[in-house]
Amino acid sequence: MGVQPPNFSWVLPGRLAGLALPRLPAHYQFLLDQGVRHLVSLTERGPPHSDSCPGLTLHRMRIPDFCPPSPEQIDQFVKIVDEANARGEAVGVHCALGFGRTGTMLACYLVKERALAAGDAIAEIRRLRPGSIETYEQEKAVFQFYQRTK
């Protein structure tokens, strides 16, 4: 039986969710129960017990805490989500607490998916997940992604 991971919420229901670092095997089972088949880990160290759930594919992108993802990491994240969603599979993304790095990636995906301006995507992620996108550099990464993709 799955147990909801800390700070779990859908940003695009059934397609893309954010969460804090999963720490228990039951957290991974919850993700599987929700249809999540891909977990993007943005922490420098891998999530504990991630090998406890063979039905979940782990994608590692090491980003230091309070830092923004690189343009290449953002592009890789968008590709993972697009490819998984095209197969009907949902994606979860996490950092330590599910706010800074996670929120940044989620906002970038909204820029691409909903054709939102960077400020609107940041505002929407903060509405859905209060406290998200913690630093100026993380905000700047969303604006730079918007500039690259418009």
From Swiss-Prot:
It catalyses: O-phospho-L-tyrosyl-[protein] + H2O = L-tyrosyl-[protein] + phosphate; O-phospho-L-seryl-[protein] + H2O = L-seryl-[protein] + phosphate; O-phospho-L-threonyl-[protein] + H2O = L-threonyl-[protein] + phosphate. GO terms for cellular component: cytosol; nucleoplasm. The keyword Cytoplasm applies. Its main location: cytoplasm. One of its GO terms (biological process) is dephosphorylation. It is an enzyme of class 3 (hydrolase). Its EC number is 3.1.3.16, 3.1.3.48. SMART domains: DSPc, PTPc_motif. The active site is at C95 (phosphocysteine intermediate). It comes from the Eukaryota. Widely expressed. Keywords: Cytoplasm, Hydrolase, Nucleus, Protein phosphatase. Residues 7-150 form the Tyrosine-protein phosphatase domain. GO terms for molecular function: phosphatase activity; protein serine/threonine phosphatase activity; protein tyrosine phosphatase activity; protein tyrosine/serine/threonine phosphatase activity. The keyword Repressor does not apply. It is found in: Cytoplasm, Cytosol; Nucleus. Protein phosphatase that mediates dephosphorylation of proteins phosphorylated on Tyr and Ser/Thr residues. In vitro, it can dephosphorylate p44-ERK1 (MAPK3) but not p54 SAPK-beta (MAPK10) in vitro. Able to enhance activation of JNK and p38 (MAPK14). Belongs to the protein-tyrosine phosphatase family. Non-receptor class dual specificity subfamily. This is Dual specificity protein phosphatase 23.
